[in-house]
Amino acid sequence: MCRCPLEHHEGMMTSAEAVAVAGSAQEHGRPKWPPDKPQVLGQPAPARVVVAALVWLLAGASMSSLNKWIFTVHGFGRPLLLSALHMLAAALACHWGAQRPVPHSIHRRVLLLSLTFGTSMACGNVGLSTVPLDLAQLATTTTPLFTMALSALLLGRRHHPLQFAAMGPLCLGAACSLAGELRAPPAGCGFLLVATCLRGFKSVQQSGALLQEERLDTVTLLYATSLPSFCLLASAALVLEAGTAPPLPPTDSRLWACVLLSCFLSVVYNLASFSLLALTSALTVHVLGNLMVVGNLILSRLLFGSHLSALSYLGITLTLSGMFLYHNCELVASWATRWGLWNRDQPGKGL
């Protein structure tokens, strides 16, 4: 995770830290927020974060490649239907695990999150069905920039100056990669751009619902959002894909096995994503998500024979350098301080 001081990060705490702080405040008769030693309170969190991040990265990379395989090899021209099946699988999987009903006070926020959730998934799958997998993944590298801007505007979060600096190589790398892969249709790129923006907005919404006053658990929140999203996506698939998409082959067992596996990976991916948001932050999740891009580029080359240009490889290098700067901003700041390039007493003035 990012090694920035808490005061320069996003002003957020994990649920484990919040419970410990509340108990400490009751014992001493006065509130204490934030705690003096957050690293002690959050000792169980690192292992959980690592496990959730690994599961999230593996499930996400596998699901993207499998979805592209379904669209390309099996000719499954119904991305909205596939998105609806993903949401139906999430609702069925989380039905018995939801711990409590969603409070009435946040029903509107949950419905808005469901709308964003379903729309981002639909746009992502529609874009993935029309553009190469490598380009679809490279487009997602700009998600941290949207997430940082939205978290600052909507939630008033503060960020370390070097985190803002890290957005430069992240987005420049995405721009170079996209410029080197202009063979994709404009409509597909448009859907990917919309999906990227909505993904950042969705993460900010999820982070607020999970980590603020209601503190919903991941299974309950996924169940609450999956049902409205399924209704939205199923209706869209019925209206937009019923008469235009080719008929489904009912006897193609390999296709339906891939669809079932895709639904399973979607449930695992969403649960891991929600857990990461509860343990870290929306911005950290999307910066980590850029690791998924590298894995999908390798899979795209192996499975679909994609070949990247030199400009795209330059973009990958810039993206990885931006990720390093974001996650090691305190290390970079201490190195710059020794060389007289960074003044810790004036955090607003950077490199």
Curated annotation (Swiss-Prot):
* Similarity remark: Belongs to the TPT transporter family. SLC35E subfamily.
| Source species of the chain | Mus musculus
Q: Where is the EamA domain?
A: 125-179
Respond yes or no to whether keyword Transferase is given for this record. no
Q: Major place of localization? A: membrane
Q: Which InterPro entries does this chain map to?
A: Sugar_P_trans_dom, TPT_transporter
List where in the cell it is found. Membrane
Q: What does this protein do?
A: Putative transporter.
Q: Which GO terms describe its cellular component?
A: membrane
Keywords carried by this UniProt record:
Membrane, Transmembrane, Transmembrane helix
Chain coiled-coil ranges: none
Membrane spanning residue stretches: 40-60, 79-99, 110-130, 135-155, 162-182, 218-238, 258-278, 279-299, 301-321
- Gene assigned in the entry: Slc35e4
Q: What protein name applies here?
A: Solute carrier family 35 member E4
**In terms of domain of life, where is this protein from?**
Eukaryota
Q: How does it sit in the membrane?
A: Multi-pass membrane protein
